[in-house]
Amino acid sequence: MNVEIISSKLQGTIDAVTSKSYTHRALIILSLLNNCGKIINPSICEDTITTMKYLNAMGVKTIIENNVITVSKQSELINPSFFPYNDNSCTSIRLLLPIVTELFTEANFLISEKLFERLTNTNLESYFDYQFSSLENNKIMLNVQKKAQLPYLKLEKTSQYASGFLLLSVLKNSKFNFDSITLPSYLLMTIDYLEKVGITFDIIKAENTTQVNTYNYNLINYYNFNVEGDYSLMAN
């Protein structure tokens, strides 16, 4: 599968940089597909490089050449003894935590104290059981485990955990409950992306909540598509 990320225009006049939000999701989705693929015109920045390092630790090979990232793997994804040091990228860890805890039940991440504080200030404890130990040089070893039952997904502080859980749709049919009737733009972007690889969504709105059911019966491994949006370098 090849994904081309098209730079959009802000208000129709200013060229926006390629979206790192799309690049994160493309890297993760391709890594979960059997035959992987290529990302054309990706955003190469600190955040997306961190996502690639995490995927590399899981046995995914990523090669950057001529503004294309080639994503491949030779076997099932593996759980490293710990994921490589991450100083600042909340996006990478929030999007991947739902996936690695689903695949491996628990995982260890070497992170900075600053990143640990950012994670714990954005509902980490709502979705995962965790323990941590302080190391030298202001580093933290974070052990994260899958909760027995997933609660309502909170969208107030960040939708990145929620997007990570939605990305699980590539692996299995799922049901998610959100604490809002309005889904934020980044979550809708994730849904749009997943629909392009064949995931079907059933979205049911109640008075103050939204239920999203996902079905991967028609998952596509070989379809090429383009994505476009005004997300630039923002993250939410």
At which residue positions do the language-model features occur?
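Structural preference for solvent-exposed beta-strand-turn elements
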Residues: 1-236
